């Protein structure tokens, strides 16, 4: 799957790319991308932080994390998210339709956002209920202020926690209202649904993943005073409050 992703962005010579290999031996030939091979499996949070640190050190103002089971359909995707950020003031967005979470629970179903907000200059934002970390956009400013992903999380709720921290500081839309391009599916798609492509939720690793999830769930609660979901989860916001927030951050 990685080679298909790389093929879909290989002509973007104006971008800084880094590949973090946190798995088995990886052979990447024919691409002008820097590859970092972890000496041991570090997990999601630490590996993504290596990518974020590299891009910040390269003075990138707009940063994207892309997991290897995604496919770029239109390589102008980066410009589209940057344009939307500048039009809306939202400095952290994510592709919402990897897996079933924002498709009414239906794998490979149709997008089902909670709300679509239209702006001028042909920009529209979809607001989704669930936080999905397969393709994420950040401004440099947001990362320098909030910091990187909390490495106490182990392959569960790491990106959710980070996105929540960004939301608490006003760089992202509120929890349960995660922002994406309204037409993001014109630019990107999943090669396989998250349940099929995950390397941390295989049959052999399922028990380990459950243990990590429970520990990360408890750590999330100790950190924020609420859980990532459930009866004592992060409180939802009303649509009116979300719209008021969007007005306050609009440039």
Report residues per predicted region:
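Conserved donor-nucleotide/metal-binding helix-loop-beta segment in metal-dependent transferases, i.e.
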Residues: 76-92
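A recurrent flexible, glycine/aromatic-enriched loop bordering the glycosyltransferase active site
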Residues: 118-138
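A conserved acidic beta->alpha catalytic loop
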Residues: 20-29, 71
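Short beta-strand-to-loop acidic/aromatic patch adjacent to the donor-nucleotide binding site
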Residues: 60-71
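C-terminal catalytic/acceptor-binding lobe
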Residues: 152-156, 160-251
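Glycine-rich, basic loop-to-helix element that forms the pyrophosphate-binding segment
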Residues: 39-55
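Short, well-formed alpha-helical segments that are part of the catalytic scaffolds
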Residues: 1-11
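Short beta-strand-to-loop element that shapes/binds the nucleotide-sugar donor at the catalytic cleft/hinge
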Residues: 93-108
